[in-house]
Amino acid sequence: MGDIYNAIAPSLTLGCGSYGGNSVSGNVQAVNLINIKRIARRNNNMQWFKIPAKTYFEPNAIKYLRDMYGIEKAVIVCDKVMEQLGIVDKIIDQLRARSNRVTFRIIDYVEPEPSVETVERGAAMMREEFEPDTIIAVGGGSPMDASKIMWLLYEHPEISFSDVREKFFDIRKRAFKIPPLGKKAKLVCIPTSSGTGSEVTPFAVITDHKTGYKYPITDYALTPSVAIVDPVLARTQPRKLASDAGFDALTHAFEAYVSVYANDFTDGMALHAAKLVWDNLAESVNGEPGEEKTRAQEKMHNAATMAGMAFGSAFLGMCHGMAHTIGALCHVAHGRTNSTLLPYVIRYNGSVPEEPTSWPKYNKYIAPERYQEIAKNLGVNPGKTPEEGVENLAKAVEDYRDNKLGMNKSFKECGVDEDYYWSIIDQIGMRAYEDQCAPANPRIPQIEDMKDIAIAAYYGVSQEEGHKLRIERQGEAATEEASERA
């Protein structure tokens, strides 16, 4: 197998190469007709670690906008809440404190799940009315994601959204390659919630509300030019948003650490980000106003960005693939969806499958060991075996979610209608399987398994119970169909 698993390109044949010992192109020559068994030596492909050129952090880091080179015409991308909270005014104050005069426009109509129409509308304004040299995205993941695609469509109007949403397995070898950005404008991302990590990643999630699809768009050209991680701006997060965003960051760290793209450069970021979230999320949400809570909020803000740096190069997995799908179809907050699914995915990936995914640099399935390492890093009992460590970690995540944060245990508790949920189970399985995050999962996610997990997560029961419920439902449907035919 070639691509990320081996530097040898596949021959796509089972001819004499297979007879010689394997099916790669380096084993299909005349010499291989002799009955000598040869096996290609495994060579790992080059990997990468890519982040914005500049990342500024610590309280009041937005002051960098006063000195940043080349800001004369700026567009501020946000939502209405950022204006109401006065955060946009703080950005404007920094621009007005510059030595040169800055003209600016505000795009304040980004919705919680930014749509294709919204990004196209914003890009059209930039092209036709203003032509900014700087795009400043301020807010949660939605304004930052929207600004990335606006940036792309502003600089390259010839590109259509249908092109950039094309799937790929290896980001370096995709059918459609996004051209470089930054010739017309720089993108500055300023997060005000501590979760998405979008300020340092090459990802943007855009929703097609006509079809209900959430598209995770991925290309390193979309990596912001500058990230400003100012914890002061995150102090206004409502309690529920802080919980959801924090669990999103925790899921980023977990999935980056067990991803098939995980590497020495991302592992440190992922583990430390997970530890920071574990130690500080509850205090940042529940703590009384004061020095301890302020410190916890600062650590959470840093953790979210560090987790973003990890998954920006290691990618995510099936938890996010399912969360994108269920969130779009059921209108459940992304972080809340992740918090509901994460324990199920830990147990699913933590059990050794009959046919495990091949891992780069590894010759056996090691997800259980990786979860055990996460547990040990968090101070959770790692158990005597990897299997014990997996179960202890899943239970600890459930306990943290349920008891320390008081979050919903199931999608039913989130208010999702039961009949509607059953009507979309097939869509959930198929769309999650097709999601761009799924290929990096350590265990190849099967559609039927994801249906079972989705059903289990609706009722808050085990995956095994979810499987039984699905089989019973299928039997009832078959009986009803037979009766109608009779």
What are these regions (language model features)?
Residues 1-46:
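C-terminal segments
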